[in-house]
Amino acid sequence: MTPLSSPLSQYWQTVVERLPEGFTETSLSVQAKSVLTFSDFALDSVIAHPEWLAELESASPQADEWRHYAGWLQEALAGVCDDASLMRELRFFRRRIMVRIAWAQTLSLVDDETILQQLSHLAETLIVGARDWLYAACCREWGTPCNPQGVPQPLLILGMGKLGGGELNFSSDIDLIFAWPEHGETRGGRRELDNAQFFTRLGQRLIKALDQPTMDGFVYRVDMRLRPFGDSGPLVLSFAALEDYYQEQGRDWERYAMVKARLMGDNDDAWSRELRAMLRPFVFRRYIDFSVIQSLRNMKGMIAREVRRRGLKDNIKLGAGGIREIEFIVQVFQLIRGGREPSLQSRSLLPTLDAIAALHLLPENDVAQLRVAYLFLRRLENLLQSINDEQTQTLPADDLNRARLAWGMKAENWPQLVGELTDHMANVRRVFNELIGDDEADTPQEEERSEPWREVWQDALQEDDSTPVLAHLADEDRRQVLTLIADFRKELDKRPIGPRGRQVLDQLMPHLLADVCSREDAAVTLSRITPLLAGIVTRTTYLELLSEFPGALKHLIMLCAASPMIASQLARYPLLLDELLDPGTLYQPTATDAYRDELRQYLLRVPEEDEEQQLEALRQFKQAQLLRIAAADIAGTLPVMKVSDHLTWLAEAMIDAVVQQAWTQMVARYGQPAHLDERQGRGFAVVGYGKLGGWELGYSSDLDLIFLHDCPMDVMTNGEREIDGRQFYLRLAQRIMHLFSTRTSSGILYEVDARLRPSGAAGMLVTSADAFADYQQHEAWTWEHQALVRARVVYGDPQLTSQFDAVRRTIMTTARDGKTLQTEVREMREKMRAHLGNKHRDRFDIKADEGGITDIEFIAQYLVLRYAHEKPKLTRWSDNVRILELLAQNGIMDEHEAQALTVAYTTLRDELHHLALQELPGHVAQTCFSKERALVQASWRKWLVAV
């Protein structure tokens, strides 16, 4: 065994002072001295439990002792009588075995592959032991869940990721998916429960038993977000629901995740075999599938962007050449050829590497280097985490922990360890790039073209200097360009850039100037880009991105030239520069029905318990998607209707995620309202009004929302801190508002306006569905019924959605006096015009002035309220374009008039979108849109003025 290094020998004196009673420096073995000096986790544990140290001193841990874990845990749980004592014993057992593993790992008593196996078996043993105890307890309370034939149904648990692969790291969280075989009901209990309810309750108790922090700590952080539909989906799914999802909706990244899926406590019974057989075709295709390479490349790009966003330097998992890249290399071959080559279907990485070598899919030397690098990195990761039982993959910055790792990795000192690490990661990166990398590089022609611009950049020409490369610009433009460059250089002198930053900037600027100054609008474009550059000069990562990826630089210039809104967004949030790397996604926004799934995948990389990071991630995702929508808008690939569709679907995905976060936080605090025990769903709905309800969001639109619940009176929550059920929903709505409006470094998510709720700002923030119906029928004003025309549920379970739709239909199909309605709608519009109309007499306010967008909206709303009692189909849609279509189809409005109003409406909205992209107000010269305005005014007179 390697003697302790000098810094660690000095630290040992600190350890001696903390030794438990009965142990002295002379009474301890050299092995104990080494472990307790290396790991604060081990030291703290034996201080609390001195008998563990005595046990380890008398008999060292063995390589195959994982075979005894299940028996040891069974003994530990023999006296458990309730959930609290179960949680205590699970935590005690986990800590005791983890100390044994840390001891064996630190002293290299067991090889590194076996350590990974022990960590994985420990987790599996604890999961299965907790599940089995809780299953029996739940059966005693509610009966045994059975299928219609009376066959008892088990809870099956899929371990995902490193747990599934038998490669768990020391302080890992665990990714799980819960499933049960067939629908049915419980039998033999005090009352019958549907199987879905039984297994949901069992799943919730199991997560609590493992995940909830107590005075004894926790067992594992449990992450359930890999299940179908993520946090918004059921906690536990039947086999049939799982099969439907993966056949019809399973995404590429879910396929990759499922490669490592393994049943916990698999005893190879009929249910287990059925589940494995069901999932296999989804994971391994019968044909050779080369689409995998691009998908994995995209995933790696997402991770690289995450590393930049979160400033994850020295990260041995996610960094270039890290553990994740080795996993990607192996998965490429599994997913391309696994359907044809059974040897590639292993869940574990090292056996799969052996299969890759046997099939000659990679050179022997590459496979050997990957194996050595993987074991090196995994040992380093485990040692790093075992110091404090902390989930981290970032190398330490302090001398003590660096000395610990150097000793644990058998290096002479920290620089030697870093040198070995650098070599291993370089080998991994080389193989990765050869296989799925796509680095760009400058061509010789581009270098030659940019060379003359070095003089312009580096020689700091004055505005009256002449240079051949600027000769094509007009005098004023040339002066502006030189002034902008000079001012930018002066600004740089005030910034702590550092030598590497200046070097990258000197490489970048000639290329940037060559591209910008070839444009007619060079001065304007440069004036938009220099603030962005000034914002990132101290963040070398982003300068390198623009320097190393010429395509990204070209897209930056094009987008900034086209839109000051995009330029200012990029300047404010430089992390958006990552989106410029892939033109395939930049100009092709996410499919309208895929925003929820994209967001779910994005949030999976953020710890569920880290609220601050979750808030940042939501805002960053929204900004990236807005950029892609705007880029497609500028490129002309999205018409105005589609722009609003995308902005609306994006907002709905955000609402879904925010409600989920708020719900999780509230349930953790109070439990959920007890009436939900008897029904599916959450008893909560979010209704979108205005532009959101009408599928007409713009780039900077706020969200008009109201919140509904269906909680009866006198219902309490079922958590340890009981509160009234209606109070729960009020706090939930307040939490949602808070999550939307909290300002982080990435800004707010959306401005939310909840004043359209019953009684406006004076009313309750959240309303029961019955109270909402009563208000609409007996108290609401006509303008509130107009608003209801453009309202729809944007989040909610089917029961509440149907209830809201029925109320909306009832209100809109109520017969009204035509003359009274006409007067009320017209007078409301005149009040709005007086209050909001354009104050610039020589300008036309596209939205608020006569003949503008609001007039068209009022015409549509008036006609729906006027005629829906005769033509109920008019209530079907909440957006103006389809309402106009319905009016024509139902004979209310002439088809030619409806078509003309639709064209006018989309034309005016298109102009508003493009004014927003130019950061201009929503008014234009009076001479603009005269034809459209005349047409709208004629229609207004026909419907709302004529007697």
UniProtKB/Swiss-Prot annotation:
The protein's UniProt keywords, in alphabetical order, are:
ATP-binding, Magnesium, Multifunctional enzyme, Nucleotide-binding, Nucleotidyltransferase, Transferase
What are the required cofactors?
Answer: Mg(2+)
Q: Which InterPro entries match?
A: GlnE, GlnE_rpt_dom, NT_sf, PII_UdlTrfase/GS_AdlTrfase
Ranges for the region named Adenylyl transferase are 450-947
Cross-referenced SUPFAM superfamilies: Nucleotidyltransferase, Nucleotidyltransferase substrate binding subunit/domain
Its Enzyme Commission number? 2.7.7.89, 2.7.7.42
UniProt signal peptide: none
Instruction: Give the CDD domains listed for this entry.
Output: NT_GlnE_GlnD_like (cd05401)
Q: What GO annotations for molecular function exist for this entry?
A: [glutamate-ammonia-ligase] adenylyltransferase activity; [glutamine synthetase]-adenylyl-L-tyrosine phosphorylase activity; ATP binding; magnesium ion binding
Pfam families, A to Z:
GlnD_UR_UTase (PF08335), GlnE (PF03710)
Look up the record and report any one GO term of the cellular component aspect.
cytosol
Q: Does the keyword Nucleotide-binding apply?
A: yes
Q: Give a GO biological-process term.
A: regulation of glutamine family amino acid metabolic process
Q: Give the catalysed reaction(s), semicolon-separated.
A: [glutamine synthetase]-O(4)-(5'-adenylyl)-L-tyrosine + phosphate = [glutamine synthetase]-L-tyrosine + ADP; [glutamine synthetase]-L-tyrosine + ATP = [glutamine synthetase]-O(4)-(5'-adenylyl)-L-tyrosine + diphosphate
Q: Region entry Adenylyl removase: which residue ranges?
A: 1-440
Say what the protein does: Involved in the regulation of glutamine synthetase GlnA, a key enzyme in the process to assimilate ammonia. When cellular nitrogen levels are high, the C-terminal adenylyl transferase (AT) inactivates GlnA by covalent transfer of an adenylyl group from ATP to specific tyrosine residue of GlnA, thus reducing its activity. Conversely, when nitrogen levels are low, the N-terminal adenylyl removase (AR) activates GlnA by removing the adenylyl group by phosphorolysis, increasing its activity.
Q: What protein family does this chain belong to?
A: Belongs to the GlnE family.
Protein name, per record: Bifunctional glutamine synthetase adenylyltransferase/adenylyl-removing enzyme
**Gene from which the chain derives:** glnE
